[in-house]
Amino acid sequence: VTIADRTKERGSVAGETRSASLLACVVNVSEGRDAAFLAAADDCTASSRLDRHSDPDHHRSVFTLAGPSLEADVARLARLCLTRLDLRRHEGAHPRLGVLDVVPFVSLRGNPTEARRARDRTARLLAHDLGVPVFLYGPERSLPEIRRSAFRTLEPDLGPSRADPRVGATACGVRGPLVAYNLWLDPRTPLARARQVAAALRGPEVRALAFRLGDRLQLSFNLLDPQVVGPAEIMDRAASLVSVVGAELVGLLPAAVLARIPPDRWGPLDLDVTRTVEWRLAGHGLLEPVPPAQAD
């Protein structure tokens, strides 16, 4: 998260700062197993990192970044990925374009155009300074469209027209706050049935995929409008169609989304106030603490 033109004045309401803009970047990296690499990635993002979620099955890590050094830390993480990772050796369940796979900027408060400007600056750095093909998403197109069409019917927006097979390409985007969320199914469920359920649950607010991960079965979601369809709603909808045995929050969620869910459901849904964006921002001195009941 970065705060542009941030003033020293705090808002009078808990959870508010008076600032021109409040941005986040949620960097998805195609590495979820190498402890030495992940330690180096933690080090180079230490000043802005709100959270890191690493998944060895998907072989993927998600870094939620915040703070005045946001763009510098994204650049440091990008250079580390391009130097240390090799897409040719990558094996994982999750679709990926490159070692630095997805770099979305998110406007949390203030002028949404600031997120697009940050995206465009980062895209130019990746393409022109680091030589990575960059596909833009947001107003231009959706991320799923890039995954379907990159290097087939869709050329990179910036950078080389062909990707180095070692590092691949990057999707650099701008989007609203979403919740990444996984549900674990009864492993005896056929994968074909899990895919049917994923298809049934997809909609304007929900992207869904089904994966067999060893002896486990997962539904993986991006909840694009979590105020409409959040973790509780997707759990209830899925449980009406298939046997669900567990849940997993990937990264963080907005406090306002948590506030909509009865606290007695937080545990089974793998949710907690300490895993809200606002709680982590407060821990970095970027925002006053926000009790979930006060989020709006």
Please give the residue ranges for each predicted region:
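Long, contiguous binding/interaction regions
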Residues: I3, G15-D296
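Short linear segments in intrinsically disordered or otherwise low-structure-confidence regions
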Residues: E9-S12
